């Protein structure tokens, strides 16, 4: 393909001066109405609007102020939080806590990654320190009925170690034995119920099953963000029988960042979206185009955009039925003054394998028989320069096939750049899925502002969808600040 055609194809991807002054460019160039200072939160399950007075990006300090009985400073979300409950509310009360402890186990039933267990600890500790009797519920895997390999027994030692107390485990999640264990649970004690998905009624959100779960407790805390997008008995059904029903610290933090920081970001605000298919990220891209100043695209989806602009893509992954959509998204970005950057060079391979022959070519130079598997060094440089201008960044999806070392450079470069920006005070949000695996692989997870624990839940929240597990919780009482 002629270079002139390539130049023409990429000319609409970079707004003049947009990277250096993207917020200003966006305001001038937008042909469509931009939302004013407040954005409706009702589609997300909240009762009010999202503005800078109502959303906090400093969850840690907020939790400390709750513990110190000081002002929360802001109302971070319109759902009641466990931090709103005092010792007087909790002492001696039986609290049903739905956590997401769906951790990976090896063939020896040993936990290989305890991230989700550690993420649930702050809420559980807060409850036991305030004299509550904690009834802990979670699922593990996708069992078909009672399945021994999906028992929660392997979780007990690690839970006990992290909490500093001996956690008791029930052999069921409802029934007389469980009721007896609950009755003997001391203040500050923790009872782990058996896998709630051993009952098919859980995923069917069966009202009678939900009622049996709820009958064990006095109030409800949902800290399972990873399942908040599912209307299951333990995430949505129980709220009809337990009041108050509130968010745990982890769920609250997810909402603070994935709703608060994204809806009212410090600008310039950049979104990085990767992954293999446009179809799986349509909702995210469309939603972020309404909010961001800079949009960086990577991963296998870029080849659908390339082909939509008339470029040859060789044997790269392309969704033929999404070519028109790709063109529409590019036009929408231009109309809104969003600086949308596609990679200008890519790493191509002659087969999809770790030992493939590979080379770096311009985006306009992908030959027949070659497939793109990562972004190239020039693109990394351009993306990094764009990110250097930002104050808020959210990342969802890898830049290439990072599981293969030959094609991991782009993803690892983004992870390292976000770590660098985090240390400079930029708000960095890792929006779930493979991006989380990437920052953990590079060893920079600890410096990010927020790493989402949700996969599908993160995507649906970013798309602006209603999360049943969130909308079912009690509304917060507004705080004057």
Curated annotation (Swiss-Prot):
It is an enzyme of class 2 (transferase). Its EC number is 2.7.2.3. It catalyses: (2R)-3-phosphoglycerate + ATP = (2R)-3-phospho-glyceroyl phosphate + ADP. It is found in: Plastid, Chloroplast. AMP binds at residues 277, 281, 300, 372, 403. ATP binds at residues 281, 300, 372, 403, 434-435. ADP binds at residues 275, 299, 402. Mg(2+) binds at residue 434. (2R)-3-phosphoglycerate binds at residues 99-100, 102, 116, 138-139, 141-142, 197, 229-230. CDP binds at residues 275, 299, 397, 402. This is Phosphoglycerate kinase 1, chloroplastic.
